[in-house]
């Protein structure tokens, strides 16, 4: 589990006690190729996310059929980024804190959420404003969390994977 993400895995089980939480460590294609999923969520928390064309096609079809994908990574690249028309910008701050917040009033914190030491100020430098709902921004107002409606489902993309770990 990336970045000590076992905490979010454990929390998911208590937050969704009536739901099945499954940890998979296989390539996307191997998981989705022979199965039909409906109303499910697929979560990725990685340093960088760059699936190949085959995995991208399976992921796009999975979401188009009404499922959701949450990806939190410093950068999202390759075929998936091209298909969703997004680009990420990477910047590393070794001694500076990063402050992030949500856009939605019901989730927004007055002071935001701060992460210290060894931080990345990564954000979406390009996205299609007609397709995207901005969900979060950095203290510098850079977009770091967004939702893209795709078919019957959604992609939730985030550039602060350390926020979902026990790293800080």
What is each PLM-predicted segment?
Residues 2-5, 30-33, 116-122:
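A broad, low-specificity signal for short, low-complexity segments enriched in glycine/proline
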Residues 4, 51-54, 167-168:
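Extracytoplasmic/periplasmic, Sec-exported soluble proteins
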